[in-house]
């Protein structure tokens, strides 16, 4: 989180300019992925890359919804107060919702095949990964979880992949 609130930046021209410039750059680079896909010169109305990209997009969208729903249902259960979810998609990744959001951006690379600007399609997934992994989503969430859940969350970190879903790793406490 670069700025805590709009009130903090609107009174300082430099902060205001920085915030709006960063937002403009973000929109430009992420929209470039869609632009590259839209300008594709593929002759087929719906080729294999478009099919794979569309299926991946739909899968990512639906699984992101499933991850959010799993977490919401977990939090609604009074027995889970003070706990964090380790089941379902959350047993495969500490941030499955972020991963499947990122997958959405990756599909534009496939949809852009055939465009002279196909390489621009990489800007969306690369920027989204950097922002989610290093600047906004994951660092903030992990820091907050460590603060509120301590060693229990550290154990979860050791046993569960951070971003890319995979099988849980064995820790010293887990029997073979």
Language model features with spans:
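Hydrophobic transmembrane alpha-helices
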Residues: 1, 27-70, 74-176
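Juxtamembrane helix-capping/reentrant segments at transmembrane boundaries
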Residues: 3-18, 83-90
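Eukaryotic endomembrane system proteins
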Residues: 21-26
């Amino acid at each position: 989180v670069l700025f805590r609130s709009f009130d903090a930046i609107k009174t300082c021209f430099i902060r205001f300019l920085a915030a709006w410039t960063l937002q403009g750059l973000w929109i430009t680079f992420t929209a470039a992925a869609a632009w590259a896909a839209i300008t594709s010169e593929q002759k087929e109305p719906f080729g294999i890359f478009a099919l794979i990209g569309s299926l991946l997009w739909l899968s990512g969208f639906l699984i992101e919804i499933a991850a959010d729903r799993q977490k919401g249902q977990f939090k609604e259960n009074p027995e889970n107060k003070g706990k964090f979810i380790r089941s379902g998609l959350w047993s495969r990744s500490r941030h499955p919702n972020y991963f499947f959001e990122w997958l959405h951006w990756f599909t534009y690379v496939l949809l852009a095949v055939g465009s002279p600007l196909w390489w621009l399609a990489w800007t969306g997934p690369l920027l989204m990964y950097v922002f989610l992994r290093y600047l906004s989503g994951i660092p903030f969430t992990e820091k907050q979880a460590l603060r509120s859940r301590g060693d229990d969350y550290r154990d979860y970190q050791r046993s569960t992949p951070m971003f890319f879903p995979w099988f849980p790793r064995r820790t010293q406490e887990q029997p073979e």
